[in-house]
From Swiss-Prot:
Record protein name field: Putative hydrolase EbsB
Coiled-coil ranges from the UniProt annotation: none
Cross-referenced CDD domains: RNase_HI_like
Statement: the UniProt record of this protein carries the keyword ATP-binding: no
Protein's UniProt keywords contain Hydrolase: yes
GO molecular function: metal ion binding; nucleic acid binding; RNA-DNA hybrid ribonuclease activity
Swiss-Prot/TrEMBL cofactor(s): Mg(2+)
Stored Pfam families: RVT_3
Subcellular location: Secreted, Cell wall
Origin superkingdom: Bacteria
Designated gene of the protein: ebsB
Length: 135
C-alpha cells in the first residue's frame, strides 16, 4: 500500500501557494515540494492532491492501493461526497475523478494538522523555494 500525505501553504488568500507531498511505503519514503501558483488556500489543497496523484501515476506507483491523507476537510468531504458545492472546486473534483480511474483502489482520509506535520513543513518550504521574498 502507498500512503500519500499532502498539504498546501498560501501567502495571502488568494496568493502564492506551495505544496508538500510525502509518499510512504513499507520500503521507502519520498518527499516533494511543488509550486501551485496563485490560488486560494482551498484551491491549493485540491491542487497539491492532484499533483500527488499525477506523480504517483508517472512513477508507476498506481498499481497498488493508495491511501491519501489530507488535513483539508473541504477537500476530503468534496471527494467523499463526490460533489463540489462551490463552483470553483468542480474542475478539481472532475480532474480527481479522472485520475482515480488509474488506481485499483484509491481512498482518502482526513487527519488533523498535528498528524500531517511532514507535509505541512514541505508545503512551507515550497513557498520559500518557489516564491522567495523579493527585496
Amino acid at each position: 500500500m502507498l500512503r500519500i500525505y499532502v498539504d498546501a501553504a498560501t501567502k495571502g488568500n488568494p496568493g502564492e501557494s506551495g505544496g508538500g507531498i510525502v509518499y510512504l511505503t513499507d520500503q521507502s519514503r519520498q518527499q516533494l515540494h511543488v509550486p501551485l501558483g496563485i490560488v486560494s488556500n482551498h484551491e491549493a489543497e485540491f491542487k497539491v492532491l492532484i499533483e500527488a496523484l499525477k506523480k504517483a501515476i508517472a512513477n508507476e506507483d498506481n498499481q497498488q492501493t493508495v491511501l491519501l491523507h489530507s488535513d483539508s476537510k473541504i477537500v476530503v468531504q468534496t471527494i467523499e461526497k463526490n460533489y463540489a458545492k462551490n463552483e470553483k472546486y468542480q474542475p478539481y473534483l472532475a480532474e480527481y475523478q479522472q485520475l482515480e480511474k488509474n488506481f485499483p483502489l484509491l481512498l482518502i482520509e482526513w487527519l488533523p494538522e498535528s498528524q500531517n506535520k511532514a507535509a505541512d513543513m514541505l508545503a512551507r518550504q515550497a513557498l520559500q523555494k518557489f516564491y522567495p521574498n523579493k527585496k
